[in-house]
Amino acid sequence: MQLGLDFNLVEDLVAGVDEVGRGPLCGPVVTAAVILDPSRPILGLNDSKKLSEARREALFEEIREKALAWCVARAEVEEIDRLNILHATMLAMQRAVEGLSVTPRLALIDGNRCPRLAVPSAPVVKGDSQVPAIAAASILAKVSRDREMVELDRLYPGYGMAGHKGYPTAVHLEALSRLGPTPIHRRSFAPVRELLDASVE
């Protein structure tokens, strides 16, 4: 039994915001914003990295059903390469908060900095393992991105994206050097950029 965060910590109209996919060499960075409903408890909420895939999938459906409002947003590979990963992540977080159907009175952002928002915000370091709404956001973002990487694995076979989700594993790096980058690889990330530079020389 995986114990979750104390749902009594949920406050009215507070959005939790988190991202997944800053480290991978390919694919989008995906963010989510969630306003939980204090009257509709969700048991077992925790940092998505601490949950099994099956548990994340079950909570994904429950969060979308019970939350007062939620939004999954993203920044594309082209935006990551143009802006850099930090600015692209902030942009995707803005999109998630702006996409909520209910305006939060406060947005709590996982990490140590906040995007520019039209509502008050505060960063919470390791927020996904402390704040239920951020944990819920981490689950929506991770499940959404993982599902997309499985689809991209079908479009670009041979790289093992369904397994490593784009992270720079030995399998991914070997496939990258053997097959070359796809259109969804981040050209601004060193392993991809170095490969492209070498092919030009």
UniProtKB/Swiss-Prot annotation:
The keyword Electron transport does not apply. The keyword Transcription does not apply. It catalyses: Endonucleolytic cleavage to 5'-phosphomonoester. Gene3D superfamilies: Ribonuclease H-like superfamily/Ribonuclease H. GO terms for cellular component: cytoplasm; ribonuclease H2 complex. PROSITE patterns: RNASE_H_2. This is Ribonuclease HII. It comes from Pseudomonas paraeruginosa (strain DSM 24068 / PA7) (Pseudomonas aeruginosa (strain PA7)).
